Structure formats: C-alpha cells, structure tokens
Amino acid sequence: MAAPSRLLIRGGRVVNDDFSEVADVLVEDGVVRALGHDLLPPGGAPAGLRVLDAAGKLVLPGGIDTHTHMQFPFMGSRSIDDFHQGTKAALSGGTTMIIDFAIPQKGGSLIEAFETWRSWADPKVCCDYSLHVAVTWWSDQVKEEMKILVQDKGVNSFKMFMAYKDLYMVTDLELYEAFSRCKEIGAIAQVHAENGDLIAEGAKKMLALGITGPEGHELCRPEAVEAEATLRAITIASAVNCPLYIVHVMSKSAAKVIADARRDGKVVYGEPIAASLGTDGTHYWNKEWHHAAHHVMGPPLRPDPSTPDFLMNLLANDDLTTTGTDNCTFNTCQKALGKDDFTKIPNGVNGVEDRMSVIWEKGVHSGKMDENRFVAVTSTNAAKIFNLYPRKGRIAVGSDADIVIWDPKGTRTISAKTHHQAVNFNIFEGMVCHGVPLVTISRGKVVYEAGVFSVTAGDGKFIPRKPFAEYIYKRIKQRDRTCTPTPVERAPYKGEVATLKSRVTKEDATAGTRKQAHP
C-alpha cells in the first residue's frame, strides 16, 4: 500500500464499544494521531492534509470478519471469491480485516497449510488479514507444529471440526488433546460444533427415503445435532480449563447452550454469522433447486423463522459475542455438483460484503442494540479475543486507522446484480438495509469512497497475533491458581485390607482343560 496521506475526519460522531462523542480524528502514517475537537488548524487545511467532512455521520472502527474461506478448495471445487475479490468486497461493506482459515488435510502439515494460504493471500489481499489454523488430526507432529505456529508465525487460534466425518472430523479424545495444547501455548480453541456421526447416518437415511434435494441437508443436520456437539465441546474445554470459541452459531438450541454456559462462568464465546442473523432455512424448501442450493451451508440455516431474531437478541445482550460470515461462495454451476445428491452440494454462502449492513438493520435499526454494541460485535470483541486490540477494533491515539464513515440513515438494497463479490447469488437478495458505509479507510488510506475503489491487490498485509490474549486468559490463569483440585490430607489407613481371590467358574475351568488337551 502506498504511503497514506494525512487525513482529518471532521465533525463526525466517533463510536467505540464503550462511548460515543462528536470529535475530529487526525490520521497520519496509517495510525490515529489525535482525537479531539477543532483539530483543523486556523486558516484551513495545510498542504498534504485531506479533510473528510463527517458531520451528521458516524465514525466507526473498521469491521473485523472473524470467519471467511476465500478461494477454499472444498468438496471437489474451490470457493469463487478469492483473496482479491473477497477482500475488495469486504472493504465496500465497511470491513477492514478478515480472519481466514488454513486447513490441512488429515495427515498433512499445519505449517505447510499455513504457508500455502499465505502464498495465496499475500499477493491478493486488499485489506489486512490473519489466519486461524485447523487441527484435522492428532499426533506429536501436530502438537509441535501448533507451538511453532504460535511462537514464530503469529497464530493464536486453532479450529477443530466435530463434523465432516472422514474428512476433517476429530474424536473427543483428539479434542481433549488439542484443547490441552491450546491452553499450554496460549491459543484459543475453536470448534465447528455438529455431531458428525449422526449427520453421516442421517444423510444415508434421507437418501434412502428418496430425499436428494437441498432440504435433505437440513433434515440430516437438525438443531439437536448442533446443540449436542456444542455442549460436548464446552464440557471438554472446561475439563482442561481452555477458552473456547464456537464458530457459526446457527440455531436457537445451540445458542441457549452457550448462553447457559456463560452464565455458569465458562470461558466460551459464540459467533453467529450474517446468514444466521439475516435469513433462515425455509429457503431449503424453495421450488427452485438453485435457490435452495445456494443456501446450503454447514451447519445449515434453520427453518424456524424466529431464529434470526432470537440470535440477535442474544448477541445484543452479550450471550453471543462476535459476528463473522463463514463467507465461502460457490456459483450455481459449482453448487450443481450436488444436483442429484444434496451431500455433494458444496457448502457455503456469501456475507463478507453485507455483514455490517445486515447487522445494523437487524440489530440497531430494529432497536435491539445501540451503536456501541454494534461496534463491539462487529469489531472490538473480535480484536480483544484474537489479541489485536487496541491496534484494531478501536478509534484511539496509536490505533491503526481502520475507519468507516457510516451513514445510519442511508439505505441500500442488497442484490447479486450490484454486489462486488464474484458469486452470482446473494442470500440477502432484496433486503433493504439502513446503515451504509460511505468511506472506508484502511491503515490511513481511503480505499473506498462513494462506490469507487482506490486499492490494488496486495495492499493489505498479514497481521500476526500474539498468544495469551488478556481478554480471555486472565480468568484462565487465575482459575489455574485458585481452582486446581488438591488432595485431602488425612491419616493413612491402618486397618485390615481384604484379599482379592480369583473367581473361576466351572465353565472357565472346563474351557481351560479343553485348551490344555488341544494345544
């Protein structure tokens, strides 16, 4: 990215997660240099200073999408939005950073997967990014590579799949080992929470019944499958006192499990996504196959139409914590790989461009949350959990100048005809959203303004993340100090101890005689 010019964002309402104030924001060398009133020098702007008028608008920290899959090779295809097109679309929606996933095959090297994803992303990204790394199998090699990734590669989060049997799924014992390792090295464990065994059996049942269309995808992965795995993951994480992050929370029942666990004091965070907050699974029964197929994702959207409203309420009240998109897009011809078998439809939907507007519409415009909570769930909480704060997720002196000038009264209609993503379908088609990004600034450079991009591939950069994020590990460390079980001190037992005798039955004795007679 070229050296950014000096910027003065003047007269807007600066919104952080904990307060709002009308103020000017001075940006220099890619970071916020000053925040206050009347920062414009007398006599007007000096040479080299560009003034952006934000009067009547909101000035927000750039969004952080915690969950994307750009150009992901999956289910026989590759997601159509690559790191260039996907991050460019993100900027147009007010998101200035994504966290993608490096996912090795079973038996593959985590470090090699990480380097592969870096080689794909670094030349293409238009905004800053980081990487989670998936643990798809377990061995001493995996254990050692996790440590190397944390110490040398800037990774502090690892994802485990409880679904996708025979592809990415790990066992409960492997979860226990991976969670234990995450805690040792100061990372946060993430899980895709679905019962993979039940899904596999459910899919066989649906196909045997002649159900081959997209509706079969949801029917074989009901809410209970997600809720059971969510509770199981929380139970295992609690057993080793490891912080846990549940990705793409899609159902009311799974969300309730997380909410209950948080109220019980568990260190667990839930991530609903734009799709689960903005639409529902009734689309799987649409008469147009391509329409239904474009909504197929895992876990699936839920057919209960009250689900988005329920999840938004929990998000507004801190039972759920962050928002991602699970942006993993496939065009219609790619989805058609499963035209005769729903298990072969590549899983994934859009969202990276529309997340901020959808959450504003469904959350703030509806009255469920205020502007500060919006900033928390779209940016700040993610920055805190993944140890990017206050460099990211806040407008403050010294923070990266990732900033969005937001028009809360403006509206836009979402459509595949006008969006900037490569995919030819949009699950939010026709939704009218209040809340529109007017200007997006990435590390001090105006990269999107009034529908025009000023960015090229490679302008973004990889952001390393350190382990032991205080936001999540302060409680973990204190619990280790004060809550570790200790033995009861008691006098040794000095009484009689019974002698165990071998119980040999008549049948056992006869069998033994036969074995001796017939060696």
Swiss-Prot record:
Organism name: Homo sapiens
Keywords: Disease variant, Hydrolase, Metal-binding, Phosphoprotein, Zinc
InterPro entries linked to this entry: Amidohydro-rel, Hydantoinase/dihydroPyrase, Metal-dep_hydrolase_composite, Metal_Hydrolase, Metallo-dep_Hydrolases_sf
Gene Ontology CC terms: cytosol; extracellular exosome
N6-succinyllysine: modified positions: 256
Chain positions with N6-carboxylysine modification: 159
Function (record text): Catalyzes the second step of the reductive pyrimidine degradation, the reversible hydrolytic ring opening of dihydropyrimidines. Can catalyze the ring opening of 5,6-dihydrouracil to N-carbamyl-alanine and of 5,6-dihydrothymine to N-carbamyl-amino isobutyrate.
Enzyme Commission number(s) of this protein: 3.5.2.2
Keyword Repeat: no
Family: Belongs to the metallo-dependent hydrolases superfamily. Hydantoinase/dihydropyrimidinase family.
Subunit description: Homotetramer.
Record protein name field: Dihydropyrimidinase
NCBIfam families: D-hydantoinase (TIGR02033)
